[in-house]
Swiss-Prot record:
The keyword tRNA-binding does not apply. UreH, UreF and UreG form a complex that acts as a GTP-hydrolysis-dependent molecular chaperone, activating the urease apoprotein by helping to assemble the nickel containing metallocenter of UreC. The UreE protein probably delivers the nickel. Belongs to the UreD family. The gene is ureH. It holds the Pfam family UreD. Required for maturation of urease via the functional incorporation of the urease nickel metallocenter. This is Urease accessory protein UreH. It is found in: Cytoplasm. Its main location: cytoplasm. Keywords: Chaperone, Cytoplasm, Nickel insertion. The keyword Transport does not apply. One of its GO terms (cellular component) is cytoplasm. One of its GO terms (molecular function) is nickel cation binding.
Amino acid sequence: MNTYAQESKLRLKTKIGADGRCVIEDNFFTPPFKLMAPFYPKDDLAEIMLLAVSPGLMKGDVQDVQLNIGPNCKLRITSQSFEKIHNTEDGFASRDMHIVVGENAFLDFAPFPLIPFENAHFKGNTTISLHSSSQLLYSEIIVAGRVARNELFKFNRLHTKISILQDEKPIYYDNTILDPKTTDMNNMCMFDGYTHYLNLVLVNCPIELSSVRECIEESEGVDGAVSEIASSHLCVKALAKGSEPLLHLREKIARLTTQTITQKI
């Protein structure tokens, strides 16, 4: 049963406003979701923060998020704080997210890390539909648990799926299953002693693989790599023993990308 009286829903649709910048065309949300009004930290790049007025996800919580980024919009979406998945007892919490990025639009989706508490069970499914000219930075950071309490990999199960389509053709699929009951999370093929994991996908972004690799190599305390996926798009996987190194790495890559995207003609 959902903690709230109904399924938690968030709808956001953007367009280009009269001043040529990205604005909110339409939005709708139910508890605990809220939206901050967009602000413009750089040129025509808008930033919108998604708010969740709650202590975190509980047993039975169901979230349905739909984001429609209009043509020519340049938008960065962030979250309010680290997301906590509490003890879900014998159930689970879930989120289904659908994102559409329109023609010549740019989306940088940069939420804070996800922290599964002891006995937490979370299912996440994200589908992103792109136009051939859309540009995307999408990331997730997963934490081993409440690291400061030495609560490492005590969660029940965490399963996230990311599907990216370009002109209705699949170009990327990620199926992350973390199940400490059946897998040694400290195995060298898993976290290998690290506690934080970054997954970052870049589609049609004006940054070279060599530049991303250089960012990774210059990041202290980070063990990671970048790969070229379908049609020369990029995927970064990285591990660290804290959130800050991964957040800094992600920000460095995003900054290099947006420097080109937001340049005035």
